[in-house]
């Protein structure tokens, strides 16, 4: 026969990690994960915005600008770069260390509980097999790095805030925007 008896696609194995566990090993296998809506239920930026509003650490004009840009982006009227660059401006003049600490605190207080257990298991399965695991996100470092550390992901790819020689944020994003 011409292979008609071979099922295509092959039958799926049951369980979220079964296919990874049955697959090849080693760092030549890449596993790429997105952050918001994939590893995490919801959006890490929303958790940060809520926290900053509660602490009165975000001026109303900044908040309204970000909301307006987010709506315009969703409607296809603004580029994503405009939204992410506006977000970076809200921390201009602050110490990078403080913004990173804020990200860690928000992760512990709200984002850690939003990580899907099935996705955590899938990340762990890839790590057990020795795969190269990457967390790729358009979010900012202070949102992505805590999740990557928590999950033991060594390769986060995300947008990074620019700091000057004293560690003060300039309000810019390293180019190119991810």
Predicted feature descriptions by range:
Residues 1-22, 26-28, 101, 108-178:
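C-terminal cap/substrate-recognition subdomain and adjoining C-terminal extension
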Residues 4-9, 14-75:
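Active-site neighborhood of HAD-like aspartate-dependent phosphohydrolases
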């Amino acid at each position: 026969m011409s292979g008609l008896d071979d099922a295509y696609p092959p039958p799926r194995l049951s369980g979220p990690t079964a296919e990874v566990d049955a697959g090849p090993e080693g760092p030549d296998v890449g596993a790429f994960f997105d952050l918001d809506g994939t590893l995490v239920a919801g959006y890490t930026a929303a958790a940060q915005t809520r926290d900053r509003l509660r602490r009165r650490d975000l001026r109303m004009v900044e908040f309204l600008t970000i909301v307006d840009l987010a709506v315009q982006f969703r409607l296809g009227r603004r580029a994503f770069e405009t939204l992410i660059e506006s977000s970076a401006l809200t921390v201009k003049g602050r110490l990078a260390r403080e913004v990173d600490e804020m990200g860690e605190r928000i992760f512990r207080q709200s984002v850690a509980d939003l990580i899907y257990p099935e996705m955590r298991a899938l990340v762990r399965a890839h790590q057990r097999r020795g795969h190269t695991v990457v967390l790729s996100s358009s979010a900012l470092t202070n949102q992505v790095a805590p999740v990557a550390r928590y999950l033991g992901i060594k390769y986060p790819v995300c947008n990074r805030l620019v700091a000057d020689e004293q560690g003060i944020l300039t309000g810019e994003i390293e180019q190119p925007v991810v």
